[in-house]
Amino acid sequence: METSRQNPTTSRAKAKSTEATVRLPREALTPEDHLEILKQLYLARYFDVRLIKEKRRGRLTGTLYSSHNQEGILVGTLFGLRPDDWISPIHRDMPAFFMKDLRAGWDNPDRLGMSVEEVCAQVWCRSGSPGRARDNWSHIGSRSKHIIHSTSMLAGTIPVAAGVVLADRLNGGDAVVLTYNGEGSTAQGVFHEAINFAAVHKLPVITIVENNMWAYGTPVELECPTEDVARRADGYGIPGLIADGQDVFDVYDKVMTAIEYARAGNGPSIVECKTFRAYGHGDHDDDRAAKYRPNDEVEEGRSRDPIAVCKRYLVEKGYLSKAEAEQYHAENKGAQQATDEDFPPDVVAYLKKGVDYAIKSPTPPAEEGGMWVFAE
């Protein structure tokens, strides 16, 4: 049976909210903030590009879960957080681990986010990595950095996130937590249980739904009976907002609206970010994805690169000249086509520092294989 599918990054990226906003949160951003947002988009994209190249050169093992074309969600959600706020990333949010609290300074050792060296060591399964070389991807966390441990059971960390901010409230705090989920995970029973609990107790849990239209190989119309996943919020009596995931500033506006609502004691929100997955579920699925996704859907999704959308907006606002916008060309290029010259030199140097650290770090000795299995 064939169904008519619309790309959410264009025809369905409508702004919907139960809360009217007179002044957009982005209006409080400085010109420097706008340029920093673009730079962070480049950083998230370069992380993806560099790792895919390393994997295809045989210098990296394990599975990669690309965030290519979804960087607007990462940057737009993280940029407005306070250092003491919490995040709960998933497998497609690997840059979030080192991009949390990046506004405090990329090389600031005191910022509440992991270092790029730590995250790269995790990817290369090196000694001293957050996962102690037991895993090469996102199954890591840090209480001191306010990052909730990621798991393969999608939506499974939402109850944990609710518990974290409940404890914070009981201790007199007003931190919020962002939980990241794919649209497929909203059909999980634990998603309902956690959101219902957060709504009843008015907990500051902001659920970011990265709707890239596919839960592995299952299309969104077989996952959710409504056109907009955010409508699930209606059943809990909480706001359901919809953002254009390709527009980092629209994501920022919607998430900041939800953050302000939560921090004021009003409770949780769901923010659906309509986006497009550039590749397969993981790099093991790239070839298969080329067969199960319609070509026109792929072409339309790739036509709205979040870096290009951001650059156009910055030029329109006068924060970026046309010459500056044309200086780098990472947008609309696949990982194999993009080169270091397509990115700002400081972005390349920053990630190279992490990659070099990981490659030079030792692998753990065999005798550590039985350690950290049980609490001692």
Annotate each language-model stretch with its function.
Residues M1-I73, F79, H281, D285-E376:
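Conserved acidic/glycine
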Residues A15-T18, L38, S127-P130, N196, ...:
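Short acidic/polar alpha-helix capping motifs at helix-coil junctions
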Residues Y46, R92, G245:
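Residues that form or immediately flank small-molecule/cofactor binding pockets and catalytic motifs
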Residues V49-I52, R57-H201, P219-P225, A230-G237:
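Cofactor-binding active-site loop characterized by glycine-rich and histidine/acidic residues
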Residues H91, C273-T275, V373:
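A general secondary-structure junction signal
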Residues F97-M99, G217, H281, E368:
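Short acidic, gly/pro-rich beta-turn/loop elements at beta-sheet edges
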Residues I147-D356, K360:
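Glycine-rich ThDP/TPP pyrophosphate-binding loop and its adjacent helix/strand module
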